[in-house]
Each structure stands twice: as structure tokens, then as C-alpha cells.
């Protein structure tokens, strides 16, 4: 929780402040801000006065504030320093009000006013425009107008909502990160010192903004600490006696002038000396702060007095006891003052749960030691108390007068003060005694600054009598090491001494002895309680546990499981407690699992719960009977709870032991730990387990000497072991039944425990079943044998970690399958459908090709069902690797079934045309229907399954809808989608029934893509053109090797994102010809086994032959009849994946209703090779999209996937396939083809067929969501006949130069789906585009003769503009074509270098390829933009490339035409000006701030808010802020345009400074001269020019 700073009263030299007017005073506001309460304690320093303010924000959050008092003894205060400062002036930029810069925002609020009326509505409104809480906060604190040398730093501001739309106070979309409240030195400072003073204020504000940026979100909690001048709060002050601090207020304090003052408790001195070393380090850390803020004279004095190191055992003086008593008295006074002030406040009084009270003596004691300990606890920040305005005089402080009267009269003072100011609200029901409140306050001090390690010591001390205090302190000094814990213990003893003094000296008083004694004992007990559980400041200690029962229970259960399985290696008990504490707090602050008494659970969980409860109830009744009916016997509820807990503990123990055994099987020794719980009970069992597991480990490791029998026996042993334990588990469960009052945490626990075991056993059964069936089958893979392990994430869903027995890795490879990381259902669904296009091509090759070379990669006979549900899960990579190993070892690999030759299949299909149709349409023949399993209509089934998939349906099981006469077959059960689609190895697909008599069955799209097996090995090693295709080739080889193991057709295998490469190659090949024939080179393919090239070659041969056949008249009739038999059946809906994958021989106007989203993997290439032959499809019956989920990743855009499909084919070909084909001589080199490419007349039938085939294939790849366009979208996109589309297809395929003839083909259709994201990378035309986006290249842009064509993300739907040199088109998306085509802005030169589309690392290294997709301009929908990853460098670069890129959306900007014309005027001078000062205009184009990589991390946006604008000189302030930012090294400083009324003049000043290469010193000198002139002119009564006018006039 970010901590905020605010200031209370000023330090004006009153006696209260001891005359230290130059001293910094820090006021911190520790806020407990949760959804349950919003209260704030404001406390100050120097005297123990507090003020409490209730921060009543409706948003439930709070400010934090720090007050600083500037002084003039630092190097930054000398004018010489500034005049000689030769640092470079930073850049200045301007932002539109609607633009969210993404960089830290600092708001400077100037409180200068002509009137002191704080209740003026205008003032309140202006303050609220910065933060809604600011006016109330200032008013409730009663803050007077700060002095010139006082500033307030605010952070954690809430965004303004009320004034956001007020045109007179335009605000940024998000609130400022830091706000600095100050009063300026009048309208214009006259002295150089005043100018420097203002600069220092801006320095502090800008530096705070930088700090908040540097530490990220965590800095919110540390910002207060960083902003504080640690050299002031030196550590020696931590243990000052109360008299030394309070004594400054009263010279008549007898103890202060006592010569025994030096004889303080030795332990305190020694502790102080021990901390002296830390002080120097902290001062060194804080040297930057101390340049701006002075150090305290008091702390310097203390440094001289007490920094002598006192090592060894010091001698304890005889006066220790007496001085300890004095010390205790003074401490008691300060604590009682604190209590008294609390009681006398008008605001609601101290609430024990919400507020953290700290007295001034100990106020500094926490910061530095906490930092030194580097404890991971985030303790509440300590608050320093400062006096309010109404107690400026000494006489108003009764405790000072009392102090002069009696040293030890704490009780009397307490009563006197209590009588003078009766409490308004008491924390307890009855009026609390002041001493009790004081002790409670002291206890909260101790609880605040301690850690759990101290609890034990405090517990020991609480048992001792307070008379032993001196001995205890002496024993403290014996330790030799004076840690923070010992200091706290000393403080607790001192607090105990308070009670001792009161008890001894006030015994004759009205105060009751018993009360005193119990209060002193209560102090230590409260201290113990508060140290035992120090909560984060964001959680109130009084928060009810009720709402978080499930979260806390879940955390504790996970920790117990982790302890059992030895997964967490805790270094010590303290480490364990600390970690658990953090997790519990995290579970409370971020509750993910709402607590519900009646939570829906599955039947299995309910049965186990009932069984356990029944069993426990029986046991409890027996124990109740044994106890007897005596009145002292506990009720049955206690017995029942005890039994249930014991039972659950045993279950958890047994299960955890199993998990632990499995996870330990890779370790060197599998010895059980003697100390672990339940070890002896399961010792024999573990021994057997270790035996089987060691053999299992042996079988996993890549060994040269094991055969199938050994593998089989090892797996059987493991199965027997797990089965034995399963039986034990079931035996316990079978004895129980009904559940009535078992709470949810137990249900959750048991659910997880037992589900794991059942899963294990079923998986092993599946493995053994397959081992029986196939002698040469591979080891169980990740999908078929997951050994699920629990892994806790506090308060979240459990992650399943799958341990896959993978032979390639030789170890148990952990695969995380986290539902949070897995893709959204829409993404998965789209990725499934995206691969339909390639399956069409492979079907054709499979069905219609002669297999001349004798290879049989495609088909095998039907293999019948398999016993286990996972029987068909045989991932290609693992299986192929094992099979290759066996072959190397001489093991014979025998195929059970000889696959039929392709010629046989072709003959069958010719004999039975219905078989052909069935094969072509097989995707929709069997699907999942979760609602109506009895439905037999495959189309309805498929539609409902797709709908369920999109609507985020959980785990899908594939229902077998085959006819009753058929042999049963198993289907895949795919639990989750693989996280990110990174791997290209997937599950194989079940077999196809080749028997024509039966209904064909296939797999629904819910199960096509499986888990990724080898995250690292399956990812492209480099983002080169070849790697994508190489990977696909490897996968195809592995897959086809697997085909002989009980699978039917390859055509059900879907290869994911890279699958369309074969089709793209085919389309490209079809579009190019040489002498009327396709170029197929067969000589180099003879030696290749089944690979991508040979498959494609066969496909080409088929197409050649088919085209020749089609060209002859005699075959036309037959072909037409055949294709007409494949027309879509009437009940088919747009959810159909495809109706035909044969090259279209139908009439040219017949349209497919295929809707398949293509997931783009090279969007940047699309924008480069723009063409206008996008094809639209309008299905006859479209489905309403209102109920469907939207994809967050913006990968699919409604109505635009047609062109994405089209462009994907272009780009996949040019980026990856083409070079590989040329390398392998499958297609001719471009040099041989180049002349023929343009002659489209020699063989019209070839050209015709190629165009038609390509157009239909693209048309068939339409997005499913493409049919659900808005009515307006459909209206503005004219329908183009298929023939025209095919014509356009021809042009774009035949021209590789980039200036395609087809570009203008569809220019007239302006889409309402155009994107606001502007293409920013200038590119030269390349034949094969790079995959990653390049940085801007100004040279290329300026050398273009006719202008560069601007490529938008969806450029084929947008009007192209060519507007002079290097222009970029900035469009606000709309369906208004006039707006789109009317404006083009010419950015100055400085923008182009800065404005990169993506992070620098992905551009320069090329190891990660990224594309960026902008969302459509649709106000009703989420318009967020994101980056997708195309290919990774080494399998782990997913975050490295993305790191600095801003993933926020690119906002839409309206066009500011007057600014454009201004900028055009100055374009020439800016382009030539390469000096240090560059003006950046970020109004219409996407700003470099949001995407500029590392440089944006330090840029700052400055807002200025003036209560009365007349009171401040805006130009002078802008110049001083410019100087401050340059001094800090900020690369760029941004202002809001509306806040700078003198925008034009500032532009000219920036130009001037750039031309003259001004440095900071030059600008400062000019400002100083101007202020001096201003003073002279004012005295003479002459008119005063403005700063910018004067600079432009005199400095040219």
C-alpha cells in the first residue's frame, strides 16, 4: 500500500520546536486502507502532540504526505553552482489532455492566494481536481498557508472524477503520481536566492517522481522512507531519553541540568554506540537528500557525544538504577502526553485496531534499523507527532508545568490532564484510565517496530518482576551484539519501568494498586500479542476473519502439504513463520476464493466428505461414551472436530508421502528423513516405493540396455505400489458417510488430496493397458501419465504441475499447466479453426495422389478401440525419439498393420463417391454436445460444441456418437489447452473408420491441440525464415512415423500456427507458371523421406494432373457431377468448418460458408505488402455475436479476418516457405521465372485455375466471427463477386515489387473497422520481409521520390495517403472517409528516432519477433491493444523482449489542424537542427512515451495547479522546472498543452536554446538577469515584459 506524506503545522521557531527553525520535520500519515475502513492518523514530531484525521474517501484509499523545510547550506543553494552548470538541457514536449503518457506525473500545487478563505468553492474545486481528498484533508488538518521554505509532498493520490470533465480545469486521464504543495515567492522572485529556492522545490518534486518510478509499485510503501532525510533522523536519537527531547521545551527541567544526566543507563548507551556505525552508512546512502536538505544540529551534537564505539563488556555504573528511574519517568511523560493529546482531540478518538501510535522519543527508532535488517515484513510506517497550531505556547502544556513540580508524579499529571480535557471517545466502553491508554500506546509502539523473533524474548521478560530491570539490562550488555531485537527488549523493559515508577510513587494516590499492576502486566502481554502478528499496514488488526476463512485455510493447508513433501526448503523456523505470514496476509489482501458455506462441489468430493464425517461421528460418539456422562465431559462437538482433524491430517500425511516419494526419485538418495511426521508408520511402505521408483528412474534415464520387458515390470511395480496405497485410502473412506457440518476448508483439502490419487491410478491403468497392447509403444507421455502435484499459490486456484516421464529429457520434467496462463477459449477455438485450410490440402494429397514412390505416410488400417481412456495419447516427438533409439539398438520395430496404398484408397473412393464426400466433410461428423448427448445430428452437435467452446466451457469430453453396430473407440480427453501456443508438437488424433458402411467419426475442435511436450526444444532456435518450416517438417516426420500405430489419417492432425505453410506454398506455386506448366523439380527430392517438401511435391503433381484434366472437355462433365455431390447439406450452419477441400470446379458464383479464423503470425509483414484484393464472405445465416466472449488479445477482428487470411498466405510464403523450396530446388529460382511471371496470356487455363483455386481457398478461410459483422459494417463494404476476387488475386500474386496493381482494387470501400494505431516504421521494399519490426529509417524516408506509402495495420481497408516526404497518416477511426483522407501531419525530425514501435531489444537482436495488433475503433468494446509473440529466441525470451514496452492501448487522437500548420512552418529548421534541445510534439501520433523502450522510464510529465493564476509567473516557472529536470538528468519533460498558454513562445525559446546550444547555466543566467531587470523596472514603474519575450528579444 503506497504510503503518503502530508504536513501539519510549520516549524516557526516557537519554544515548542526548540528554536530549530531550519530543521526538517516529517509528518507521515500511516493509513490503514482496505475495503473495510479508511482511517488515517496524522502525527508530528518534536513534541508528543497528535492530531487524528478521518480520511473519508468514498474510494476507500488515502493520501500520504511528507513535509520538508528547506534550508540554505547546501551546494545547490549557491548561485555559482548554477551559473557554472554545464549539464545538457533536457527535451521539452507537449501532450494533449486526453493522452495518457505512461510516465510519472508530478503535479505542483501553488497555494498562493490573495485571500485566506479556505472555504471558497473555486479553490476547493481546483484542489479536488488534483485529488478528491485534498480539500478535505487540508481543511481538516487546519493547515495554514505554508511558508516559502516549506513544501508538502503527497503521493498515492486518487484520480479526480468530479472535475475531470470540467473544461476550465482539464485534467489528465490518470492522476498524478506525486503532488508537491507549496507557496511560491510572489509573482516573480527578485533575488537569485529565491530563484534557487524555487528550483530546489522543483528538484524535490521531480526527484520524488523519479523515485516512485524507479521502485515501481513497491515504492508506494517505501516512498516515505526514501523521501525522508535519513541523516536528520540519525540513529543516536532513537534511544534519547525523554528528558533530552522534551527538556528543550523547558529550561527549568531539573533532570535536564542534573550532572547525572551523563550517567544514562549503560545498556542504552551501548545500544546507541552499536548503532552509530549504521548511521554513517545511512548518511552515505542519503547524500543526495542532504544536498537539498540540511542536517539537524541536534543530531550532529549527538553524533559527537555518543558515537564512540563501546565494544566489550562495559562496566555498569552504580547510578544505573536511579537514572533508569528518571529515564522511565521521562518516557512515561511523553507517552502520557501522547495519550492526553489523543483524549483531547475533537476528531473521533483513537481506535486500537486502526491506528498505530508512536511517541516522539522512539519515533526515529524504526526506520534505519528496519532498513538494516532488510526484513521482508512490511511493517507500518512510524508516525512522528507534531504540535497543532492551538498549542503554540508553553503554558498550554500542563505536563511541562507539572514536570517542574515533580519528577515522578506521572499519575497526578495524568489525572490533571484527564480532568482538564475529558475524552470524547474512549476505545473501551467505560472511561479508560490515562495510564492504561499510555501503556496501550507504548505497547503499540513496541508491536509496531518488532518482528516475530522478539516474541520469545518478550515472553520470558513478561514473567519476571519489574524490580529485576537492572539485571536484565545488564544481561543485555553481556550479549556483545546489540541487535535491533535487543533494543526493542530494552524498550519493553523501560516501558515496564513506567509502571514501576507509578506503582512506587503514586501508591498514596486514588489510583488503585491492582489497576496499576495489571496495567503494567497488560503492557507486556499486549506487546507480546502485537509482536506475534505484526500485520501489513493495509490490513487492520480488527478485521473480521469471517470473510477470509477459505483463503486462510487454503494457505495453511498448502503449507502443511509443502512441509510434508519437503518441497519448501526453509532455512529456519523463523523463515517458515515469516513466509507463512506473508502468504496469509496476501490471501487476505487479495481474496480469490469467496467463503461460502454452501459451495457447489462435485459428487466425488461430497461422497468423501460424507464418509469422513460419518466415520468421525461414530468415533466421537464412542469417545463420548467412554468419557462418561459427567458434567465436566466436553460436548460431542469437540470430539467430532478432533476426530475430523486427525483424520484429515492422516490423509494429508499419507498422500504427501506419496508425492514426496515420487518427487524425490531423481535425487541421489531416497532415504526418508527420520524427523518427518508419519515416517515410521509408512517406513515399510516407503521402502517398497523406493524400490519401484528407483527402477522407474532407471527406466526413465536414456540407457542402452533395457528392453520392453524391464520397462513393463517397472511400471507394473509402480502401479502395484500406488494401488496398494490407493486401497489403504479407500479403506478409510469406505467406512464413512454423511456430511453435515464439515466446513469448506476440509472439503477443499480432501478434494485436492483424493482427486490426485484417483488421477494417478487411472493414468497408470491407461499406461499399462497400452503397454499390453503395443510391444513397441513408448513410455507414458506427459498427457497420459501426469503425476499431479499440488503447488500452492496463496488464495488462488491450485496449479497442477504435471510430472511427465519424458525419455528425451531423462528426468521428471515439470510442466506447469496453469489456467491463468492458458489461452482464452476464443483464442483456442480460433487456432483450431485456423488450421482447416491446410487440412484441405493434405486431404487432397491423401485421397487423390498416386503413391509412386512407395511411401505410405498417410493411411493405416482401422485399429479398433483401446482399453484406457488415454490409450490413444501418443505424442509424436517422444514416441519417435524412442522408436529411433530402439532401431539404433537393434530392436526390430514391427508394424501390426500394413497401411493400404494410396492407390487402393483412390480406387475405393472412385467406386464409392459417398466415401469421398464423407472424407472431405469429416470434420463435422462427430462432435461434442454437452447439453443433449442423445442428439444424432452431427451439425447441431458441432454447432453446440463450438458455442460451448467459445463460452469458456471447462474441460471437454468427446462423446462417441458412432452407430451402435460399430466398434467402440476411445476419444481424447483433453483437460486444458497448452499455455501459449509455443510448441509445435501436439497430440495425435484418433483413428478414422475407413469402412464405408459406418458413419465416419472424428474429433471435435476441443481436442485437436494438446499439451506442449518440450517447451525449449520445440521452439525455433532463431527467427529465421527456415526455422519455422524446419520445425514443421520435423513435426510432420514424427507424426507420420506415428501414423502406423493405430491412427487412421493425417488429415485430422492440426498443426497450429505454422500449418498453413503447405497451402501457401501451393497457392504461390499455382499462381506462377513457366511455359504453361508448374515448376516441380523432382531430382533433388528422391532421397527425402516423408517431409514437407515431398508432401508438397506430391500435392503439386496432383494439381498439375488435375489441371490438365480439367482443361480437357471430356472430363468436365464428370468433374462437375462429382463436385456438385459435395455441396453443403441444408442443415449446416455457419459453424461448419468446411464442406469441400477439393479445388473448386463449381460455378464461379458458388460461395463456401467456411469460417476459419487464421491467427496471424506476421502482422508487420502484412502491413508492408499491402494489396487490395481482400475477399468478403456473407454467410446466409449469421449467428448473433452478443453472447460470445471477446478475445482480449485483439488477434481477431470482426470483418477483417478475410484479408488477414489472404495476407497470411502471402506472408507465410514469402517469409518462410519460399526460401526453403528454392534451397531444395523444388521451385525454380526467381531469375528463371521473372520474365514469365507477367505474361498471363500464354496458358489462360493455368492462370484461371490458379486464380480460382487461390481465391476459393482464401474465401474458405474466413473467420467464424467474420460472419457476425455489424450492420453498419456490412453496409459500407460492397460485395464483390467471386470472379472479381479471383481476378484481383491474380494481380497480387504475380507482382512481387510491392507496388501491386491490385492495391486500388478495393480502395473505395472505407471500413469502419480501421485502426487508430499508426504504422511507424519506414521500410524499404523487400521481397522477403523481416519478421520483426524495424526502427525508423529517416534516410530511406527522405530519399523516397514519390513519397512513401503509409501502411496501416489494416491498410487494405483504409484510404492510402502519399503526402510528401516521409509523411505518416494519423487518422481517427471512423466510417467517415473525408476525415480519413483529409489530414496528414508532418512530425519533426526528433520524433522519428524516439518513436519506436517496439522495445529496442527485439529490434536490434532479432532473437524475438514481435508484432503489434491495434484494436478496432469500436466504442462499445474493449479497445486495448497488445503484443503477440511470434517466435522466441531460446525458449525463454518471452519477457526479455517485452520488458520495456508499454502494453497500454494506443488512444485515438483528434486532429489539431492549427498545430499542424505551425509545425509545418518550423519543419525545415527542426529537421536540420541536431542540437541538444529537440521539441517533441506528441499530439496526433502515437507517442514515443508509450513505446519508446528504456528512455521512457525516466521521462516526467509536469502539471501545475494554481489556486490563483495571477499569483504566479507561468513562464518563469516553466523555465525553472526545465532547469530542475535538466539538473536531475531527465531525458524529456512533458507539459499539458492546455496548461501552457504561451505555447508558441515556448516553442521559439526551445528553438533558440537549441540553436545556441544552451546549457543549464546559460538558462539560469538568463532567468537571473531577467529577475534583476524585473526588480529594477518595478522600482521605476515601467512596464514589465514576460520572460520568454525578453529572452527572444535580447538573446538572439
Swiss-Prot record:
Principal location: cytoplasm
PKA-RII subunit binding domain as annotated region, ranges: 829-846
Biased composition (Low complexity): 1398-1409, 1430-1443
Protein's cellular compartments: Cytoplasm
Residue span of region Disordered: 214-233, 242-319, 389-432, 462-481, 760-809, 958-1022, 1282-1310, 1328-1443
Compositionally biased tracts (Polar residues): 292-306, 959-971, 1357-1372
Keyword terms of this UniProt record: Cytoplasm
Keyword field contains Signal: no
Composition-biased stretches (Basic and acidic residues): 1333-1356
UniProt biased composition (Acidic residues): 462-479
Domain of life: Eukaryota
Keyword rRNA-binding included in the entry's annotation: no
GO molecular function terms noted in the UniProt entry: protein kinase A binding
InterPro entries given in the database record: SPHK1-interactor_AKAP_110 (IPR008382)
Biological role: Anchoring protein that mediates the subcellular compartmentation of cAMP-dependent protein kinase (PKA type II).
Similarity comment: Belongs to the AKAP110 family.
Annotated protein name in UniProt: A-kinase anchor protein SPHKAP
Species this chain originates from: Danio rerio (Zebrafish)
Gene of this entry: sphkap
